[in-house]
A protein has these predicted regions:
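Nucleic-acid endonuclease domains
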Residues: 1-45, 49-52, 59-225
Length: 225
């Protein structure tokens, strides 16, 4: 077994353990049973839930200012949003074809200005739909079709070192931050800036990890202060 596979499995195991610890904290805090059993995995945003409170939680732990919130292929993304023709070409150029690595993608200055503007306009016109996919419910290939997943209601930033909650917000709180903001395009990334000038998300080409994940669309979320 390769060291990459082994470390990936360990990370998943550690993550599940931390979700269990947070579930206990939330149960003690609210007096209502929270659990991470029967949820999680690569096709859901839900890490912890409480049926009695109708709370469906995504747990985030970040050592820095941001952490991954969504990872998907351009194929799944474009299929979900029914993107084709010139706009589809931009996605193939900016992120590169699957498994082509950094050498297979183009940067903003290497792409036609009209295509870049087409893409930026699309992200801003569809900013709430983009938010729903990357934060609220995801988009996953199931039974041969790309469908949205089950929606979360809350996001919690959890400090794995101290086993304490840093911040808990509702998805609607995050959605309201998005409504007044906009996407901007840089040479190799897109950034989302809210109405107060704070960076909330960025989108980059995944360049690390196994070849099968390279050239994927990797979204990061910034911790709410």
């Amino acid at each position: 077994m390769s060291s990459r596979i082994e470390s990936g499995r360990k990370a998943k195991s550690d993550g599940h353990k931390k979700e269990g610890e947070l579930s206990k904290i939330l149960t003690e805090k609210t007096g209502k049973f929270h659990t991470n059993e029967g949820v999680g995995g690569s096709k859901t945003k839900i890490d912890i839930f409480c049926e009695e409170l109708l709370k469906y939680i995504s747990q985030k732990s970040c050592s820095g200012k941001n952490t991954q919130v969504h990872l998907t292929s351009t194929k799944i993304w474009c299929e979900y949003f029914k993107i084709n023709e010139d706009l589809r070409l931009w996605f193939d150029q900016f992120f590169g074809l699957p498994r082509s690595g950094r050498e297979g993608r183009l940067t903003k200055s290497q792409i036609d200005d009209d295509l870049n503007q087409l893409a930026l306009d699309w992200f801003n016109v569809n900013k709430m739909n983009v938010f729903d996919v990357i934060v609220r419910h995801g988009a996953y290939k199931t039974d041969g079709q790309v469908k949205k997943g089950d929606a979360i209601t809350h996001m919690i930033w959890y400090n794995k070192e101290t086993n304490q909650i840093d911040k808990e917000v509702t998805v609607e709180y995050l959605a309201n931050l998005v409504r007044g903001g906009k996407w901007i395009m840089n040479e190799t990334t897109l950034h989302f800036i809210d109405g107060n000038g704070n960076k909330r998300f960025h989108l980059q080409m995944k360049g690390s990890g196994g070849l099968s994940q390279k050239n994927s669309m990797q979204f990061h979320i910034y911790k709410v202060c």
